[in-house]
Regions:
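Radical SAM [4Fe-4S] cluster-binding motif and immediate context
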Residues: 126-213
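Glycine-rich beta-alpha loop elements in corrinoid/cobalamin-binding modules
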Residues: 1-141, 148
């Protein structure tokens, strides 16, 4: 698995299938959906949406938003026009469609100023609650705007049951057998999911930022 795997894989896909819509999600894309500090390079990097060349990020857990994206594409909607789905991030140069958004500091500012970076992240952090979060916009120097829609609403009990009743393998990949397996599987193998997100705001944990409050 390469470093910056999402960027590497998206670049290869885009090189081969130039017009194919690319939707990214998961923990890497979700936590890097806007400008973010990167420990490997010790720099503030751009949204992964720009560096990967993908069209949309489905952030957080994403079960509902990915279905809505698929339905929109299936109906013939151009991927560039899918700007209305909660739990997604998209890019645009049209300010008219983001009139109601909270604007974060410009990327060129936050990458050079630690206080502005902290202020920018605070704005994003304060908008992780799906019931009161606002749409956010992050400007870049070429007039590109990265727009984060509010998080998707929590799943109902029936939806949650349906998700976790799917036929998962519930174990690690067989390739880990030679290394003796993954000991940590014993801690979670029989876990029961009762809720998502967290009411806390611990500095060392990204759970609230990823799954919501």
């Amino acid at each position: 698995r390469p470093d910056y795997a999402t960027v590497v894989y998206c670049t290869l896909i885009r090189h081969t299938y130039k017009k194919l819509p690319i939707i990214i999600g998961g923990i890497e894309a979700s936590l890097r959906r806007m400008a973010h500090y990167d420990y490997w390079s010790n720099k503030v990097k751009r949204s992964i949406l720009l560096d990967s060349g993908a069209d949309i990020i489905s952030y957080g857990m994403g079960e509902r938003s990915i279905i809505e994206i698929a339905d929109a594409l299936d109906s013939g909607t151009d991927v560039k026009d899918i700007t209305f789905i909660d739990g997604t991030v998209f890019k645009t140069m049209d300010r008219e469609i983001i009139y109601d958004a909270i604007e974060r500091p410009d990327y060129d500012v936050i990458k050079e100023d630690k206080r502005e970076f902290a202020r920018s992240f605070y704005i994003q952090y304060c908008n992780t609650d799906p019931f009161c979060a606002k749409r956010l916009v992050e400007p870049y120097d070429n007039s590109t705007l990265v727009v984060q829609n509010p998080p998707q609403k929590p799943l109902s009990q029936d939806e949650m049951d349906e998700v976790y009743a799917l036929p998962y393998m519930r174990t690690y990949h067989p390739s880990y057998e030679e290394a003796g397996g993954v000991p940590a599987i014993s801690e979670v193998k029989f876990s029961l999911i009762s809720n998502r997100g967290c009411f806390g705001g611990c500095n060392f944990c990204a759970l609230t930022f990823h799954q919501g409050r």
